[in-house]
Regions:
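P-loop NTPase motor module signature
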Residues: 1-229
């Protein structure tokens, strides 16, 4: 599947609107920051379009903060290509690996990349490292980013670094790594805030959450996404 075919097939995803711009920008810059709200397709469509737009044969590593996310995103990308996970797209997390000699995109957790860098600071065979959900800061992610950036600056000036995160103020990050910023607008939905008539007891938060979900089911059709403390 070509870059153009990917964009056509998944054109409903907002990230498809910036796919060509992202590839064109990386043709002239070694680092790039991409901001996009949830649901834009940045974690699934953009890595595939980046792979199709690359002129070299090296791998893309994409870091996710959680193992479940790494597996699910790899499975989704493989499905988008009409393949099984472990072919063009695979993943590696603690105690589990689904990659093959054909794998060109590996979705990893930060700890896996850190161990790779300790074993081989050159990241031989890797052309691009993508830090997804960069706004979810942690000690592991900061260490992995620092080591990758050091490799890019001191050893591999051909290594490309892409940061993807939710739409927040990225000016400081952009200045620190001297990277341009591309924004995907995403889909905008109306938001209505409703407050409970009674303040729940802080020691019975589980009951309060259950009550809110039951109320939502009664008042609305469709699915529910609950953010839990």
């Amino acid at each position: 599947m070509t870059l153009e075919q990917l964009i056509r097939q998944f054109g409903k995803l907002p990230a498809s609107q910036i796919a060509v711009q992202v590839n064109d920008t990386l043709a002239h810059h070694q680092s790039l920051i991409i901001t996009a709200p949830p649901g834009a397709g940045k974690s699934t469509l953009l890595p595939l379009t980046l792979l199709k737009g690359m002129k070299t044969r090296g791998k893309i590593l994409m870091l996710e903060p959680r193992r479940i996310a790494a597996r699910q995103i790899a499975e989704r990308m493989a499905d988008m290509l009409g393949e099984k996970v472990g072919e063009t797209v695979g993943y590696r997390v603690r105690f589990e690996s689904k990659v093959s000699e054909r794998t060109q995109i590996e979705v990893l957790t930060e700890g896996i990349l850190t161990r790779m860098l300790v074993g081989d600071a050159t990241l031989d065979g890797i052309d691009m490292v993508i830090f997804d959900e960069f706004h979810e800061r942690s000690l592991q992610s900061d260490l992995a980013f620092a080591l990758t950036r050091q490799t890019q600056l001191l050893i591999r000036d051909d290594l490309q670094l892409v940061i993807m995160l939710a739409t927040i103020n990225v000016e400081d990050i952009s200045k620190a790594i001297q990277a341009p910023v591309i924004e995907s607008k995403g889909k905008m939905y109306p938001v209505e805030v409703k407050y409970a008539q009674e303040t729940p007891d802080r020691f019975h938060i589980t009951q309060a959450i259950a009550s809110a979900i039951v109320r939502a089911y009664r008042e609305h059709d469709g699915d529910i996404l609950a953010f839990l403390p």
